[in-house]
């Protein structure tokens, strides 16, 4: 069983390398037309250049997974902001794409919790489609839209989870088919359990990104031993291995909050279930210390008898 690792957005080991610098709309409004254009251009350019630095760091450390920052283009989906963020940066998008393709990196996006399809308010669904379209356009500009995924949660229950799930199935029909084809769903820590998310994924033929921390915070009746093989099966129509999210609780009191690093004892039960299936899968680390937490966790895992480190960020068990 091969386990490959990655992390989210910011490389903590790199100095001054945020790929998510932004500008608020309030600040944006105070600028002249030319100043607005210059500011958007400068911030986006810096984010793209920082992303390139991070990709070089990932390549040097043999880190095969990476989640791009959704904030790579500031105010990209704001209705009052017009900005050709694709055409203005074609060489940089292509440079990012060339690095990803040459080194066979697995890239993803994870829009925020407001991108959902369970609301009964049409504008919420419209905004979700706008946001998904933005993420797809960025992947397309990079040249990896047909091989990369945009991950979201099912969405809020709005007082009636059953009705909300019904709305998801209706509202998702409004998302263009080529974008839906590149989306994944994740179980959340308060609303849709692992079993409920699995059922939705099976019905919609959407790959399921399993989050173990969320699962433990929002348990369902079905045991993980039954769920995980079916979760992995949702990836069978793709040409890539399943991906899971790993983090551990900040504390017992703040169980849903992510800790700085990974608590191996918290994760061990999941790993033992996965080992019984013996299916290759990828792991996205969601700890606060990102790449540093990932590398520490890999080091800890590799010290366990039977687990072999076969590259900087890949283990064999």
UniProtKB/Swiss-Prot annotation:
GO terms for biological process: nucleotide-excision repair; pyrimidine dimer repair; response to UV. Keywords: DNA damage, DNA excision, DNA repair, Endonuclease, Hydrolase, Nuclease. GO terms for molecular function: endonuclease activity. The keyword DNA damage applies. Its EC number is 3.-.-.-. SUPFAM superfamilies: Xylose isomerase-like (SSF51658). It comes from the Bacteria. The keyword Nuclease applies. Gene3D superfamilies: Divalent-metal-dependent TIM barrel enzymes. It holds the Pfam family UvdE. Belongs to the uve1/UvsE family. Component in a DNA repair pathway. Removal of UV LIGHT damaged nucleotides. Recognizes pyrimidine dimers and cleave a phosphodiester bond immediately 5' to the lesion. This is UV DNA damage endonuclease. It comes from Bacillus anthracis. The lineage of its organism: Bacteria, Bacillati, Bacillota, Bacilli, Bacillales. The gene is uvsE.
